[in-house]
A protein has these predicted regions:
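Substrate-engagement module of ASCE P-loop NTPases
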Residues: 151-167
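P-loop (Walker A) phosphate-binding loop of NTP-binding proteins
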Residues: 28
Length: 168
């Protein structure tokens, strides 16, 4: 299944998202990885009407929803969090909230998630189109003695089959 993401140059390079893709977004801290992943989640959900699950190991779902609202409404998230918005911005937020509330996006912000726990949760989903894992480095590895690099490698390898078995 080919899904354009609304990022023209990236779509041209990657041909969009395909069902069996495992895509890792990597960059230095505070470069917008989470915001980018949330945009991909919303765009995928809008385009496909399929469920999107976001496993966030760093931020709570309230913070994620705030970021999604600000992005969808095209308002500054810092101003949204502080409540210092213009009346016209509040109208944009209300419209964005209405739009986002119609989308089947689910959040799991449980700390210490493991790949088997994640797979068990995904098995209950019937119309799954995308899984986002924010901050994969915080996932727990089955091998408690592994270095962080080894643990992330093992987690990544064990995630690839998820696209074959859980995405529709």
């Amino acid at each position: 299944m080919y899904k354009r993401q609304g990022f023209g140059q990236l779509d041209a390079i990657t041909t969009g998202l395909n069902r069996t893709d495992l895509i890792i977004i990597a960059a230095r801290p505070a470069m917008g990885k989470s915001a980018f992943a949330l945009n991909i989640a919303v765009n995928t959900c809008k385009a496909t009407k399929r469920d999107v699950v976001i496993f966030s190991l760093e931020m709570g779902k309230e913070q994620l929803v705030s970021r999604m609202l600000a992005s969808e409404a095209l308002v500054n998230n810092t101003l949204l969090r502080s409540g210092n918005l213009e009346p016209s911005d509040w109208e944009k937020i209300a419209g964005a909230a209405d739009t986002l509330s119609q989308l089947p996006i689910y959040f799991d912000d449980g700390a210490g998630c493991t790949v088997p726990q994640m797979k068990a949760k995904l098995r209950r989903m019937r119309n799954l189109g995308l899984v986002v894992i924010d901050y994969i480095q915080l996932m727990q590895s089955a091998n408690k003695n592994a270095s962080r690099v080894e643990a992330v490698s093992e987690i990544t390898r064990s995630l690839k089959p998820v696209s074959y078995t859980h995405l529709t």
